[in-house]
From Swiss-Prot:
Protein name: Alpha-amylase isozyme 3A
Anything else known: Binds starch not only at the active site, but also via accessory binding sites on the protein surface that are important for efficient binding to starch granules and thereby increase enzyme activity.
Gene name for this UniProt entry: AMY1.2
Keyword terms of this UniProt record: Calcium, Carbohydrate metabolism, Glycosidase, Hydrolase, Metal-binding, Signal
Entry's family note: Belongs to the glycosyl hydrolase 13 family.
Residues reported in the UniProt entry to bind Ca(2+) 2: 145
GO molecular function, one term: calcium ion binding
Residues the record lists as binding Ca(2+) 3: 155, 170-171, 174, 176
UniProt: substrate binding residues: 72-74, 79-80, 205-210, 234, 236, 254, 295, 301-303, 314, 320, 399, 404-406, 416-422, 426
Tissue specificity as recorded in UniProt: Most abundant in embryo-derived callus tissue.
């Protein structure tokens, strides 16, 4: 009876850890996107080049690095995958080079996040109809060697009509995979476990996660047990008749909250709501940074522990510039996300190409020194057109905006630790230290 009780307790402990992951661990993360849209063009291989920058990335207090899609792909960037086990066909480098890069990050205590593209797949061959729908896995024992029956039946351009209907948004450029098919679930789960056990990845970034249901994502997360998951659920803001974002974006952030709750475990989502509001707010509309309840207006206002904040990525910024942050205001975005709740994500370009490394590192150091984490307490002290001021954990105060005179908002026992054009960060200290010149 004692052994049975011990076994039961052990099972319950594992279940509890799955349902309520280590909050402290989740809250101390800084994610770094380690590539841009054109990284595949790097002579000598991106993996090899990035390996030389591991030390610089670690110096910013980064805990997780997001790496590009590692597999064979019809498109050089990796987002039109085909042979999923073939890591030597990647434009970023070979499998051996990838494993060496991951080992270098692990040696610095940084976990590696794979860009997982499984909503759709590109086939190697045509079937008898002349349709590209014969897939090759490039791996052991015919794994991931599929035919048209593994495609969603409503993707009529490629499917033979025998699969299930798509559980998410359509992806027109390639066959949408039937994620309700048991063989698909089993073999993709095996592949995800292989990425962790054989290649060394610790977590995932789920590309185009709107393409399949949260229930499907939950299945893969439960089967493969990554330590970190962040989903790309790119939802548009609501806009008023004047073309500007509406003041209320509750519907947008609710979609993100719903997804992470339905997936559970370590699942988080990129906070597209905060990005959209913030990049409008820094253009003379900082009043947007406080919602009707006095909280942050994005996902971090409702569920910060599960929100990954960012300024730009390979899609929104880089050379694609699909939804870019104003170029002259980028550092204001970092002043916000690196001192606020949520898990901040730093973009490669801004550190290594935009000459913002020193300022970003100073903000990241402030975050680490004061223990700011995903669940930190935020108090918005002011949100007006030309000034936003907030206190985090009663230890750090951030001011964004061109207004120089902030009145009596800043207590006398706070001193400046980071500042630049239109932003300033104060830190509480028992001993008042001299303020840098140019207090803002």
């Amino acid at each position: 009876m004692g052994k049975q009780m011990a076994a039961l307790c052990g099972f319950l402990l594992v279940a509890l850890l799955w349902l309520t992951p280590d909050v402290a661990h989740a809250q101390t993360q800084i994610l770094f996107q380690g590539f841009n849209w054109d990284s595949w063009k790097k002579q000598g291989g991106w993996y090899n080049m990035l390996k030389d920058q591991v030390g610089d990335i670690a110096s910013a207090g980064v805990t997780h690095v997001w790496l590009p899609p590692p597999t064979h792909s019809v498109s050089p960037q990796g987002y039109m995958p085909g042979r999923l086990y073939d890591l030597n066909a990647s434009k970023y480098g070979t499998k051996a080079e990838l494993k060496s890069l991951i080992a270098a990050f692990h040696a610095k205590g940084i976990k590696c996040v794979a860009d997982i593209v499984v909503n759709h797949r590109c086939a190697d061959d045509k079937d008898g109809r002349g349709v590209y729908c014969i897939f090759k896995g490039g791996g052991p024992r015919g794994c991931l060697d599929w035919g048209p029956s593994m495609i969603c039946c409503d993707d009529t351009q490629y499917s033979d009509g025998t699969g299930h209907r798509d559980t998410g948004a359509d992806f027109a450029a390639a066959p949408d995979i039937d994620h309700l098919n048991p063989l698909v679930q089993r073999e993709l789960s095996d592949w995800l476990r292989w990425l962790r056990r054989d290649v060394g990845f610790d977590g995932w970034r789920l590309d185009f996660a709107k393409g399949y249901s949260a229930a499907v994502a939950r299945t893969y997360v439960q089967n493969a047990r990554p330590s970190f998951v962040v989903a790309e659920i790119w939802n548009s803001l609501s806009y008023d008749g004047d073309g500007k974002p509406a003041a209320n974006q509750d519907g947008q952030r609710q979609e993100l909250v719903n997804w992470v709750k339905q997936v559970g475990g370590p699942a988080t989502a990129f906070d597209f709501t905060t990005k959209g509001i913030l990049q409008s707010a820094v253009q003379g509309e900082l009043w947007r940074m406080r919602d009707k309840d006095g909280k942050a207006p994005g996902m971090i206002g409702w569920y910060p522990e599960k929100a990954v904040t960012f300024v730009d990525n390979h899609d929104t910024g880089s050379t694609q510039r699909m939804w870019p942050f104003p170029s002259d205001k980028v550092i204001l975005g970092y002043a916000y996300i690196l001192t606020h709740p949520g898990v901040p994500c730093i973009f490669y370009d801004h550190v290594f190409d935009w000459n913002l490394k020193q300022e970003i590192n100073a903000l990241a150091a402030t975050r680490k020194r004061n223990g700011i984490n995903a669940g930190s307490k935020l108090r918005v002290l002011a949100a007006e057109s030309d000034m936003y001021v907030a206190m985090v954990d009663e230890r750090v105060i951030t001011k964004i905006g061109p207004r120089i005179d902030v009145g009596n908002i800043i207590p006398s026992d706070f001193h400046i630790v980071a500042h630049g054009n239109d932003y300033c960060v104060w830190e509480k200290s028992g001993l008042r230290v001299p303020e840098p010149e140019g207090r803002r």
